C-alpha cells in the first residue's frame, strides 16, 4: 500500500470514522476497518482499502496493521471496550501516533493510559467551534491552544472599512 503518501488506518466507520476516512483518502493512503459489512461496503470505493474485521482481535488486527503505518484513528466511541482494546493492540503493534475518539473524560483517560497519543471528542469540539462562531459573528475560525488560549481568525467589523 505504500506510495510515499502518509499511511493511515481508520478503525470504526460510523459517522466520524467514515467522514475522516473519506477526507484522508484524498491525500493519504487509507486502510478503513470496521466489523460491519454494511459500513465497509459504503466506503470501499472511496478509500484505498476497506476490510471487515473485529479490531478487538489482536491477531487479526496485527495481520493488517503494521508498525510502518504513520498513524491510526480509532473511532469506536460507541463501544468503550472495543476502543480500549483496539488502542491497546495498536500500541502493542508499534503504531506511534494513535488518535482515539472518546465519549467521556474517564474513557479518554483510559485510552491515554493504554496508548492513545491524543483523545478526541468530535461532538464537543464541533459544538465549541459553532458556539464561538454564533457568539461572535466576526469569528472566521479559531484553533484552541490550551485551556484559556486560542489563535483566532477574526474579520474586522464593517466600521473598520
Can you describe what each PLM-predicted range is?
Residues 1-161:
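Cytosolic regulatory regions of ion transport systems
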Amino acid at each position: 500500500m505504500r506510495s510515499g503518501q502518509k499511511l493511515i488506518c481508520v478503525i470504526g466507520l460510523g459517522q466520524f470514522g467514515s467522514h475522516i476516512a473519506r477526507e484522508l483518502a484524498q491525500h493519504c493512503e487509507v486502510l478503513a476497518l470496521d466489523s460491519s459489512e454494511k459500513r465497509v461496503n459504503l466506503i470501499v470505493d472511496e478509500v484505498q482499502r476497506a476490510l471487515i474485521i473485529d479490531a478487538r482481535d489482536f491477531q487479526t488486527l496485527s495481520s493488517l496493521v503494521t508498525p510502518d503505518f504513520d498513524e491510526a484513528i480509532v473511532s469506536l466511541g460507541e463501544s468503550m471496550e472495543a476502543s480500549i482494546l483496539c488502542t491497546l493492540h495498536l500500541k502493542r503493534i508499534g503504531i506511534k501516533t494513535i488518535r482515539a475518539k472518546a465519549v467521556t473524560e474517564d474513557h479518554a483517560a483510559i485510552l491515554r493510559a493504554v496508548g492513545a497519543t491524543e483523545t478526541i471528542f468530535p461532538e464537543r469540539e464541533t459544538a465549541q467551534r459553532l458556539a464561538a462562531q454564533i457568539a461572535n459573528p466576526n469569528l472566521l475560525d479559531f484553533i484552541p491552544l490550551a485551556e484559556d488560549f486560542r489563535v483566532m481568525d477574526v474579520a474586522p467589523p464593517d466600521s473598520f472599512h
